[in-house]
């Protein structure tokens, strides 16, 4: 059983209001894709979660990655972690639906030997925290793309910390409180 679960939100998305378009993996216009900044983050996550990365000691290289299933309006969770999964040569499981399958994802993750990374949509990330015994977890911030929720097993409980990715120029640099 895993002792280590890390959760991130998908990378930055397009914004019609700000005139920021999205692109798919081939560079073609796609409102369901990532913004250019999102693609920068997806690339930076490869080093961050790999043994080559220089990061906090509680960030580990995942042995499996879960991403919320793509749908007509968004492929962002898969696009965010696909470069990482390919670089590491680990499974990318993307058939679970955001807002419906969080308990199944967690059951699968808990039966994994080694660290797990979950990339999800912000509206449903707090469900994972609640299922791991942290009902105090609020909603993931609508404009937050640069944090990692880290859960480490301590006996029968899960310790929860929030770690900044600090990958891109305007990313938060200080740890966030879980209190």
What name fits each language-model region?
Residues 116:
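Conserved beta-strand position immediately N-terminal to the Walker
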Residues 1-113, 124-179:
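Active-site-proximal alpha-helix that buttresses catalytic centers in soluble enzyme cores
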Residues 119-121:
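Short beta-strand segments
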């Amino acid at each position: 059983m895993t002792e280590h679960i890390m959760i991130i939100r998908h990378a930055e998305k397009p914004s019609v209001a700000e005139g920021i378009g999205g692109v798919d993996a081939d560079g073609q216009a796609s409102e369901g894709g990532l913004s250019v900044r999102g693609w920068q983050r997806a690339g930076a996550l490869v080093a961050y979660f790999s043994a080559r990365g220089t990061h906090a000691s509680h960030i580990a290289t995942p042995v499996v990655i879960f991403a919320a299933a793509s749908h007509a309006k968004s492929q962002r969770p898969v696009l965010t972690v696909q470069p990482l999964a390919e670089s590491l040569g680990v499974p990318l499981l993307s058939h679970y639906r955001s807002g419906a399958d969080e308990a199944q994802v967690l059951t699968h993750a808990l039966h994994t030997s080694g660290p797990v990374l979950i990339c999800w949509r912000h509206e449903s990330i707090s469900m994972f925290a609640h299922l791991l015994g942290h009902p105090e977890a609020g909603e993931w911030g609508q404009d937050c793309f640069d944090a990692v929720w880290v859960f480490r097993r301590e006996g029968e409980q899960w310790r929860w910390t929030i770690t900044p990715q600090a990958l891109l120029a305007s990313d938060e640099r200080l740890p966030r409180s879980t209190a």
